[in-house]
Amino acid sequence: MAPQEDPEDHVAPAAQRVRAGTLLLANTDLLEPTFRRSVIYIVEHNDGGTLGVVLNRPSETAVHNVLPQWAKLAAKPKTMFIGGPVKRDAALCLATLRVGADPGGVSGLRHVAGRIVMVDLDADPDLIAPLVEGVRIFAGYSGWTIGQLEGEIERDDWIVLSALPSDVLVPPRADLWGRTLRRQPWPLSLLATHPIDVSRN
């Protein structure tokens, strides 16, 4: 049976400000290797600062080699992703809930935004499995202190956009950076044509 569709998977409203569930896309002038063409999903944004994970930086480390109990639920390519430069020795897990799934009463899940939840890696994967389309596990995260991210946005380092529930589990070959820009209105969508190798421009 085909999976039930969610209208949110096709249309993301424009993001007016940074909040949990929004995306930060590296602008074309942000050439620092850690964040170049990165797409960051914001997990927390509050008075304590901002925390997010890079969605498009897969590592070569298989989930099975680090957290074997979660390997079955891990979305393809079933590798750990580099969430950012902070605490690379710590793991953080996000999941996309199935359409209509009710996580109420299930320990180990914390709502982030829409159908995205944070998963406690000490939870029982067998209890989580019926509720989610898959999980993505990140080594480390990206963090900003109070006001730091706002300054970077004012400097045009980042573009703030709304996320689709499917963005969290997109495989690396899909070019999430370009795909996210292409679904934006003109002229923002034109940035998707920016060459990966700027020396070719």
From Swiss-Prot:
| InterPro entries on file | AlgH-like
Pfam families cross-referenced by the UniProt entry: DUF179
Question: SUPFAM superfamilies annotated for this entry?
Answer: VC0467-like
Q: Which family does it belong to?
A: Belongs to the UPF0301 (AlgH) family.
> Would you tell me the protein name for this molecule?
UPF0301 protein MMAR_0053
Taxonomy, superkingdom: Bacteria
Q: Which PANTHER family match?
A: UNCHARACTERIZED PROTEIN YQGE, UPF0301 PROTEIN YQGE
Q: Where do the coiled-coil regions begin and end?
A: none
The cellular component terms of Gene Ontology attached to this UniProt record, alphabetical and capped at eight, are: cytosol
